[in-house]
């Protein structure tokens, strides 16, 4: 039987969950499942309820059941990935987030972000850079994603590609010394030495103890910086 979202029992279960009465909501959802057996939405809601109580392994099983019943359930894949990430099952989480991105009309920007983050942790630099590139297109204002993207570009000696996210970060977080240092590294890699000097000096203005910027400036200006 298809779930009737006007059903008073469904409305009551949702009200209990949304008001934080998770134990009672659990019982209400389990009763609702007897009325609407094998309903993917109810299993999804049970997963959400378990997640809210910190029962991550239980939530994982419930999201998996929801996906089994509805293989294109993008939100269930996303929440499954979040749970797997939180319990340290990074490879499984990565697969769940990647699945979200393949489902038509269910692309979830945060799934791309998490996929990039996991790839960073797993050392998959190329895949991580691709993920953060994609995320930047839909959420260009994310400072954390832009920072990771810039780090990856510098690590891969893709200095020109690092300039844009770093310039944006420098404009939006002007007192973040690390960003100015990284921007200096990018300019240095492109042999734009005058711009690099400006960036390293700015990094030192913010953080006078930055030995990396001092070393770079000494190399560029033949002047010891202390």
Segments (PLM) and residue ranges:
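Alpha-helical segment of the N-proximal tetratricopeptide repeat
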Residues: 5-41, 45-52
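Start-of-helix register in tetratricopeptide repeats
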Residues: 7, 41, 75, 109-110, ...
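Register position in tetratricopeptide repeats
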Residues: 18-19, 52-53, 86-87, 121, ...
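Structural marker of alpha-solenoid helical repeat scaffolds
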Residues: 35, 69, 103-104, 138, ...
């Amino acid at each position: 039987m298809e779930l009737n979202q006007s059903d008073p029992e469904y409305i009551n279960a949702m009200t209990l969950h949304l008001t934080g009465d998770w134990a009672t909501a659990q019982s209400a959802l389990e009763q609702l499942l007897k009325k609407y057996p094998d309903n993917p939405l109810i299993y999804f809601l049970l997963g959400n309820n378990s997640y809210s109580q910190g029962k991550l392994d239980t939530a994982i099983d419930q999201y998996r059941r929801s996906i089994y019943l509805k293989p294109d359930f993008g939100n269930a894949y996303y929440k499954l990935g979040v749970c797997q990430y939180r319990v340290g099952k990074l490879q499984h989480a990565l697969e769940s987030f990647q699945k979200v991105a393949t489902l038509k009309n269910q692309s979830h920007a945060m799934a791309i972000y998490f996929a990039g983050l996991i790839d960073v942790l797993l050392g998959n630099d190329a895949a991580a850079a691709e993920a953060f590139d994609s995320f930047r297109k839909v959420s260009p204002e994310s400072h954390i994603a832009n920072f990771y993207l810039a780090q990856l570009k510098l690590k891969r000696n893709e200095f020109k590609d690092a300039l844009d996210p770093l310039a944006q970060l420098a404009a939006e977080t002007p007192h973040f010394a690390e960003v100015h240092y990284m921007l200096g590294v990018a300019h240095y890699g492109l042999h734009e030495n005058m711009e690099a000097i400006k960036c390293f000096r700015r990094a030192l203005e913010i953080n006078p103890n930055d030995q990396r910027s001092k070393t770079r400036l000494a190399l560029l200006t033949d002047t010891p910086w202390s």
